[in-house]
């Protein structure tokens, strides 16, 4: 991890945090109002963070996060959309689905790799980033094939790809597995076989 940012983003005028989110995160409307920055400022900071060099963005269910982020960057410009397109992407959910049986939430990966004492599952972005970093390290130690998953996203064949497809990403249907897939049966291996 080269750099990080941990900021609150103010809600648009008149909007409030749903009570369920307050209960999950402990973040309140008052905190966002007093400690938050505007979405435009957050967009500019994120653009700066991912600009200038090779960038690998890692997320658990990256399709959702990338589309959400792309929309924010589009609203504010500043070169953000171009910087996001220039990055590469690793979807830890796709990797984890090749490693473990359902369910596949980040919390399940934390338990599977016995990281409960090392990370917090607080539903706060910075804690989720730290947890995801540790999960990825554990998956790499288990089998060092993470780079083969760069720009490869699995999706549930029952529902299809969620939202707009991202240009540089190869999408492939990915069923729930009952055990760790052999290297020749992982999603990247299936894509390589298809391209032959």
Regions found by a protein language model. Name each.
Residues 1-83, 108-123:
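Conserved non-catalytic scaffold segment of RNase H-like nuclease domains
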Residues 65, 91, 128:
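Acidic active-site catalytic centers that drive phospho-/nucleotidyl reactions
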Residues 69, 95, 132-136:
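Buried hydrophobic packing segments
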Residues 73-74, 100, 114, 134-141:
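Hydrophobic/aromatic-lined pockets within catalytic cores
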Residues 87-104:
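Short alpha-helix plus adjacent loop in nuclease-associated cores
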Residues 102-103, 118, 143-146:
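Short, structured loop/turn "capping" segments at alpha-beta junctions
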Residues 124-138:
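Acidic, divalent-metal-coordinating active-site segment for phosphoryl/phosphodiester hydrolysis
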Residues 134-196:
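Acidic two-metal-ion nuclease catalytic site recognized across multiple nuclease folds
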């Amino acid at each position: 991890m080269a750099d990080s940012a941990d900021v609150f983003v103010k809600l648009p005028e008149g909007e409030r945090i749903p009570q369920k989110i307050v209960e999950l995160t402990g973040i309140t409307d008052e905190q966002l109002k007093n400690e938050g920055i505007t979405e435009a400022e957050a967009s500019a900071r994120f653009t700066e963070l991912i600009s200038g060099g090779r960038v690998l963005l890692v997320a658990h269910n990256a399709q959702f996060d990338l589309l959400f982020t792309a929309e924010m960057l589009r609203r504010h410009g500043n070169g953000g959309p171009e910087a996001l397109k220039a990055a590469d992407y690793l979807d830890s959910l796709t990797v984890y689905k090749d490693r473990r049986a359902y369910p596949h939430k980040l919390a399940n990966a934390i338990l599977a790799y016995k990281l409960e004492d090392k990370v917090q599952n607080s539903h706060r972005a910075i804690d989720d980033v730290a947890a995801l970093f540790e999960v990825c390290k554990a998956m790499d130690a288990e089998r060092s094939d993470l780079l083969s998953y760069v720009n490869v996203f699995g999706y549930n064949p029952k529902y299809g790809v969620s939202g707009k497809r991202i240009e540089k990403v190869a999408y492939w249907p990915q069923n729930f597995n009952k055990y760790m897939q052999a290297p020749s049966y992982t999603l990247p291996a299936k894509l390589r076989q298809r391209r032959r």
